[in-house]
Amino acid sequence: MLILTRRVGETLMIGDEVTVTVLGVKGNQVRIGVNAPKEVSVHREEIYQRIQAEKSQQTPY
């Protein structure tokens, strides 16, 4: 795992088209902004896991 330190307003790049910007820090919460092309799905981990669980529960036709 790559670990990076960023300050509010600073950005990191993932590939050529995805940016992650630190928008704010309040207590133990960090607000981040993700800018990605429409074809790149961006989800919180718990939402992604729910989507994957729903996909695995669907019966194939």
From Swiss-Prot:
It is found in: Cytoplasm. GO terms for molecular function: mRNA 5'-UTR binding. Keywords: Activator, Cytoplasm, Repressor, RNA-binding, Translation regulation. One of its GO terms (biological process) is mRNA catabolic process. The keyword Cytoplasm applies. Its main location: cytoplasm. GO terms for cellular component: cytosol. The keyword Repressor applies. It comes from the Bacteria. Homodimer; the beta-strands of each monomer intercalate to form a hydrophobic core, while the alpha-helices form wings that extend away from the core. A key translational regulator that binds mRNA to regulate translation initiation and/or mRNA stability. Mediates global changes in gene expression, shifting from rapid growth to stress survival by linking envelope stress, the stringent response and the catabolite repression systems. Usually binds in the 5'-UTR; binding at or near the Shine-Dalgarno sequence prevents ribosome-binding, repressing translation, binding elsewhere in the 5'-UTR can activate translation and/or stabilize the mRNA. Its function is antagonized by small RNA(s). NCBIfam families: csrA (TIGR00202), PRK01712.1 (NF002469). Belongs to the CsrA/RsmA family. This is Translational regulator CsrA. It comes from Sodalis glossinidius (strain morsitans).
